Amino acid sequence: DSNSGNIQWEQEVGELSSGVAAGFGIIVVADVQGNMISLNQDNGSVLWTVNLKGEVLSPPAIDAKFIIVKTGSGELLALDKSNGEILWSYRSKLPALTIRGSSSPVIEGDNVYVTFDNGRLGVFELDSGFPIWDGAISYVRGASELENLIDSDSDPVVEAGVVYTTNYQGNLTLFDIAQKRAIWQSEASSFYSPLLIKGLIILVESKSNLRSFFTKTLEESWTSDEYLNRQLSNPISFSGYTLVGDYEGYIHVIDPLNGKTIGRKKISKKPIKKIISRSKNFYAVDESFNLYSLSI
């Protein structure tokens, strides 16, 4: 229960490899054996299980008819929501070396937007899986395999005809959907999706420094090294503020207009790994999978 934290039901499904996705009456998880498991959202009963022959490291996207999954090997799959049947698939080209992790697909209208470990954005027809267009978030620039890691492990953000993307050792890149091409980029390195708030793009980089850009002019607004090397979590928007967690179990509240910290609270002795915003409350998960419900 989101208000009390009381457990409404439990279901034993084995060791999981991905986070939880929920929507349209179902909950979907993946286990370490490559099984995708669909559960009834009301009572937790197992609706179906299908083996995808590949590890799934990120939550899938759920539509009224489809479940879109990306495997750790770079394969994109569409499953029938009612029975788990594989309806179409697409396999991306993987680089020789990748970071362990994966982005989730995003369904917007009749299209699927997904970023890959080769540093590219792909756009597909939801019904057929037909590739509509793709583009590079960044290109390799180094001489070694480590320098050439350009994985995009962050979900694309689709807003007002623009797709906002990031990757590791690459760029913050904006794509125009109508033009089907990149229209702007700034060198950056991030594991997280950019946050759009109050006319700004806020980015948590891989070393936990923060950067901000105006959405209209794309000029840099402010930068902050206050949290450098504090292993920040993903940023969220809540009550008009930007929130992040860190490796010491703190939640920090930041003014998105100037980057100034206006509050913080220690909620755990473990690193905060994920925070999620939901109406009146926001939720944080620490490294030991403790769940916290908080408000400002």
Indicate where each model-derived feature is located.
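Short loop/turn segments that connect beta-strands within beta-propeller blades
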Residues: 1-4, 40-44, 80-84, 125-129, ...
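Structural signature of WD-repeat beta-propellers
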Residues: 24, 31-32, 71-72, 116-117, ...
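WD40 beta-propeller blade core
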Residues: 37, 77, 122, 173, ...
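Pro/Ala/Gly-rich low-complexity, hydrophilic intrinsically disordered segments
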Residues: 116, 127-128, 136-137, 155, ...
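Loop/turn-rich, solvent-exposed surfaces of beta-rich toroidal or solenoidal domains
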Residues: 197-215, 219-253
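C-terminal closing repeat unit and adjoining cap/tail of repeat-based domains
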Residues: 217, 241, 246-290, 296
